[in-house]
């Protein structure tokens, strides 16, 4: 046994391990455990999923049965969808059986040298901007000639890339993944921002922030100072090197903006990195994402030139402030990835005049303060989805002169055919068995187009999750783009 191997306890060859969840994460965990020599059993609530694994020779059990016999297992490795209050994790805790997430398993296997020399992990988290920042970081590392892999909550699970040659991992992690990764100690970790999100999973904002803060327990902690909740995490970070980034002029130990240039005063005395106007992501959010990515790149000695090169050639991902079309002087922007109020606010504030398409599942988050801050930018609003009433109430309080249209369908589960309407117009969608999301978005785009004038932006930035009417944020964005193309023909 090597000196590093005890970090893997209670995992050992032949150990009975329960894998919770049969999705993409579960498949990656099964492959890693089999490679290690453990004896995994997979549990899932979906009988069809279990049958698929049985056909592949995997031992399976229902989630409820697994909870009843939890003491048979030395370890549970869970998919991030299992909240700590779910019956299975609670049963494991009561029986004294450790619960890891797939990221925790990946971290321990990598640190133990199971895949060769351990990689240096650079981890990005936050309520918003994770994917763009992590992609920027990976581009910077690649431009510098460093062997980097993009993984985590973007691209492939970390476990799926560890057998590939690399020096560095650019890892996007969600609060769910971080909750189940208590021993993670990255080379550098960044918390971009903290806003109300996933409170239905974490229970409280404090627990959500504590999960995010786990990325700050490694060597270098990077935090967005313009976000008060994120900034508060820096003083308690365990990392010996603490770095902040801001939109204003940086102090020593920070990255920021001076004279239209991104400047590093944390890893150099005073190093100019790149011009602000070379950042392709619109608005302050693009500058902040670039600063965070640059901070993590600088913490592993990436020079200024490849950082600038990566940003100049960077392309924004799908459904992230993506311009779909410009027609009759109106710009149509798909920011379907804005799945919480904080993200929607950043999106709306990037444009001077906005017809806002919003609504869906708010997941317990409040939109009131966000609507108040961005009310001056709104020239119209089109509301969709189950929780559109909460958005309408906020608009009635803080933007009473903004015209509002509700897109209503009675066929979607949990939605009312005749909702409470706050002095607004109502567009009723007749859903006759086709694609509900397409019908809703077609009506929403038509209503937004009627409200917009030349120079305005019709912006899909829902502030909410999509699963009440769509398969996911990408499906919602695709429906928006298709509706726009059909409308401007």
Curated annotation (Swiss-Prot):
An individual GO BP term: cell division
Principal subcellular localisation of the protein: cytoplasm
InterPro entries attached to this UniProt entry: Mur-like_cat_sf, Mur_ligase_C, Mur_ligase_C_dom_sf, Mur_ligase_cen, MurD
UniProt keyword Cytoplasm, yes or no: yes
The entry's keywords: ATP-binding, Cell cycle, Cell division, Cell shape, Cell wall biogenesis/degradation, Cytoplasm, Ligase, Nucleotide-binding, Peptidoglycan synthesis
Organism superkingdom: Bacteria
Binding positions for ATP per the UniProt entry: 126-132
Molecular function as annotated in GO: ATP binding; UDP-N-acetylmuramoylalanine-D-glutamate ligase activity
Purpose of the protein: Cell wall formation. Catalyzes the addition of glutamate to the nucleotide precursor UDP-N-acetylmuramoyl-L-alanine (UMA).
Protein family according to the UniProt entry: Belongs to the MurCDEF family.
Name of the protein described by the UniProt record: UDP-N-acetylmuramoylalanine--D-glutamate ligase
Originating species: Mycobacterium avium (strain 104)
